[in-house]
A protein has these predicted regions:
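Retroelement reverse transcriptase polymerase core
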Residues: 1-287, 294-311, 317-320, 325-326
Length: 326
């Protein structure tokens, strides 16, 4: 059960230190000087100060009440024989007590209490997982065929924002990205049109991504093609079904396209571990699945190129096993 607390007036809830008040003086057309008694917007250290302040006072409840600037996200699950709503009520009360002691005030018009899902940084998070903003999906679905480079850049800007919901995004978008190269003549071919329609379909039919559960093992599925690499971070839910937490992909750079297939697959694995480092780095073991069987023994081979030796040094930070999955 999630809830959203939106703090009222943000920066203005932090008082200025008395000795710093004169430094905030601003001149008005009437010739008068006005000084800020609370922290104004525009100071270079204001965002960090505000975020640090909110995070600090909520440090004792950060396991179920993380914050991001003026938003506090309270989430709860059933535990110890209590329902999720009962646990949520207890968690929410603790957060409110902390806010009361520290004189933090909420904007009730923007707060959401015990909802099915809440908006978080451009997406919606709920019990079932994470889904994209329907307004952005609608914009993608209704986007007309680009007529020039500017139109294409605008479309890809929005599409890239949603790329974590699309399997093999980099591979699909490859023909379109070629049109953005310097001195490239604009030619909208059938291949570009198919890529455009495929990308729209991939995003409009985006799956609901699962929320990561640190108590369950992670596994990563990697793959590589002639011009792109991609991966998916996954877990199994309580019913044993595979759930995707995030898709991730990118196109191969100039020199990387000349790598042999073995090295491309290994690069895909390295890219996956780097992208999902926050979830995978640690003592808990996880599994990497690949469709290239030789990678199972690559990390133990005594004959390594300098490039592979560097990559294996990177892999040594992680506790994982490689399994073949055709």
């Amino acid at each position: 059960v999630p809830s959203l607390q939106h703090l009222k007036d943000g920066y203005y809830q932090i008082l200025m230190r008395e000795s710093d008040i004169p430094f905030t003086a601003v001149s008005t057309p009437s010739g008068m000087l006005w000084e800020w008694l609370v922290m104004p917007q525009g100071l270079s250290n204001a965002p960090a100060t505000f975020n640090r302040f909110v995070s600090h006072i909520l440090r004792s409840v950060r396991d179920f009440a993380p914050s991001y600037f003026d938003d506090i996200f309270v989430h709860s699950r059933a535990m110890n024989g209590m329902t999720d709503l009962e646990v949520h009520r207890m968690h929410f009360r603790r957060v409110m007590e902390i806010m009361k002691v520290n004189k933090l005030y909420s904007n009730l018009k923007k707060c959401i209490f015990a909802a099915f899902e809440i908006p978080v940084l451009g997406c919606f998070v709920g019990k079932d997982g994470v889904r994209p903003d329907p307004e952005k999906i609608k914009a993608i679905n209704e986007w007309p065929t680009p007529q020039n480079v500017k139109n294409l850049r605008q479309f890809l800007g929005l599409a890239t924002y949603l790329h974590k919901y699309s399997k093999n995004y980099a591979g699909i978008v490859h023909p379109l990205s070629q049109l953005l190269k310097k001195d490239q003549e604009w030619q909208w071919t059938d291949e570009c049109q198919n890529a455009f329609l495929t990308l729209k379909k991939s995003l409009t039919e985006a799956p609901i991504l699962a929320l990561p559960n640190p108590d369950k093992p992670f596994y990563v599925v990697c793959d590589a093609s002639n011009f792109a690499i991609g991966n998916a971070l996954m877990q199994r839910d309580d019913d044993g079904h595979e759930r995707v937490i995030s898709y991730c992909s990118r196109q191969l750079r100039g020199a990387e396209r000349n790598y042999p297939v073995h090295d491309k697959e290994l690069l895909s694995m390295k890219y996956a571990l780097a992208k999902h480092r926050v979830h995978l780095l640690g003592p808990e073991p996880f599994t990497v699945f690949t469709d290239h069987a030789s990678l199972r023994t690559a990390i133990k081979s005594p004959h390594l190129s300098q490039r592979m030796a560097r990559w294996l040094s990177f892999f040594s930070e992680y506790n994982f096993t490689v399994e073949y999955k055709p």
